[in-house]
């Protein structure tokens, strides 16, 4: 009996956890007229099988834990067994007597890169198989000799639940009976070429244990009762191109913390953050990545769980509750999503089955030297499918209203941040990443077809053409693109002392040359208030009064310029310090009138932007903007019209010097009475109350190419919005 393993290579492979097809040996098999059940339970002292005539003992045929039963009549399948360990006995079913439930169609579509809902196939799924409740595990590891599920249910022993491989697909599967929600698990993988043993978390894991642990957690689905059907119906019908979009960019872990400095949960945030956004007039929130990530300081941009909300703030259903509350409050939710790179943590995607599976082998294609991360191999169908399924998952399962795609420029260019000799050209000899381009197009087509009204927004920092134009017209297919050029020019201009701004006037005007080449978002994002760049307030020149006046003027310019809007949390408070991911925003600043004034200004501008069609309807159309005068560099003044689709308009006048400009004549296309509907210099905002509060009447005095004109007061470092009527 003790020499059996020497005579049986199958058993040797089981004992050494090297069997490529354990189902061919373990479980129930027919040998001529006889049936054999083989059971490997290394921690069991004794085992029994339930047959039609009752419980019968299994023979221990190898001291390492192999039990066998032989009989002429097959037992009921799946086979029910009883095990005894350390004097304790329990009943379960033999995992090797369950049939496969993977269909050839699923495997085919996955191999083609077209299994959009791969998250319903891969990962760990609570289910009932052949009348027995348990969990089905599926993972892709084509270069593995053997894959096992290990967890708190099998002593984390890779010999116990060795999986079934489905031919050349590289897809491994096993159903383990009796497991329940919250069981922890990983995959143990033996590489076919090297014999290296790797312990990996689930790429399709739906939730994970608390840090620093890295195990995935079996998670139940489908129990949350959504209340946002009306929102989704309205979203599908909405004309987002002509609708207001004023987005509040938020890192959930540092927006606000509790009295002990600990994270607020998704549900607590729903009850604090959502009412705040309503009060402030935001239309959307953009969440910095909430997909699972190990390091706070990565801000979520080094993702290890592409299908798992981070458990820092609660469960997946808690995040669903947060999104649901946003929708019921009329606020859309955009998820920051990171398909451009992934971290090198040895327990996650990196070298997943001992080979460069999700990434390229060659570091000239497969590594971001700047970030110390790997680049996805977009040309591999299964990798592309993984990412497409991730995007689909967040939109389908969490009702997200769109994706902000991070670092698109790094995906588009093979030579991104690389020196000569550090990159490989494409098949045409160029520097464009053709596989990434195809992936992005496929992503955008999928989102727009499957989720009507959902948005895709590109953080793309180059002049790549047609990023936000439809794929059928030759574009990448994004809904919108961040206008990094406008943002950089504007912040550069604002940091100059007002006395020198006259020499940099083109930074205010140049953006109109390309403003309608894309559907642009004007972003003052988290990237502008970290890593020594200083807070927006600290960028502003001058004394305290001038700093706050400049900041009020900057917000007025952003909210009246062509393009949708985005501000990082804290911009509306006039944070004095840079953003710190490990602490809350400085809410105590609102005890000071300067900061209170900035918050009031942001709130009033947000509501005005939503209420006045001229400020949002034609953000992407040159007909929505007209320069009245863009050439007054000597006085650092610009003024322009913003128009709505019905021809109604507002007049915007901005003064970028601390000099009061009274008696300033400006042309206007319409005679009559005008009123000031916004003034950044109002005392309510902390300003000096210089303006046009009594209204204005045009004069039949041609000016600036128009038949009529107004004589206005433009406050120092201030902006006013004037409307006919």
Curated annotation (Swiss-Prot):
The reaction(s) this protein catalyses: Transfers a segment of a (1->4)-alpha-D-glucan chain to a primary hydroxy group in a similar glucan chain
A GO MF term: hydrolase activity, hydrolyzing O-glycosyl compounds
Pathway as given in its UniProt record: Glycan biosynthesis; glycogen biosynthesis
GO cellular component term of the entry, any: cytosol
The EC number(s) this enzyme carries: 2.4.1.18
Record keywords, A-Z: Carbohydrate metabolism, Glycogen biosynthesis, Glycogen metabolism, Glycosyltransferase, Transferase
InterPro entries linked to this entry: A-amylase/branching_C, Branching_enzy, GlgB, GlgB_N, GlgB_N_E_set_prok, Glyco_hydro_13_cat_dom, Glyco_hydro_13_N, Glyco_hydro_b
First-level EC class: transferase
GO BP terms: glycogen biosynthetic process
Active site: 406, 459
Stated role: Catalyzes the formation of the alpha-1,6-glucosidic linkages in glycogen by scission of a 1,4-alpha-linked oligosaccharide from growing alpha-1,4-glucan chains and the subsequent attachment of the oligosaccharide to the alpha-1,6 position.
UniProt-listed HAMAP family: GlgB
Subunit details: Monomer.
Family: Belongs to the glycosyl hydrolase 13 family. GlgB subfamily.
Protein name (record): 1,4-alpha-glucan branching enzyme GlgB
Species for this entry: Methylobacillus flagellatus (strain ATCC 51484 / DSM 6875 / VKM B-1610 / KT)
Lineage of origin: Bacteria, Pseudomonadati, Pseudomonadota, Betaproteobacteria, Nitrosomonadales
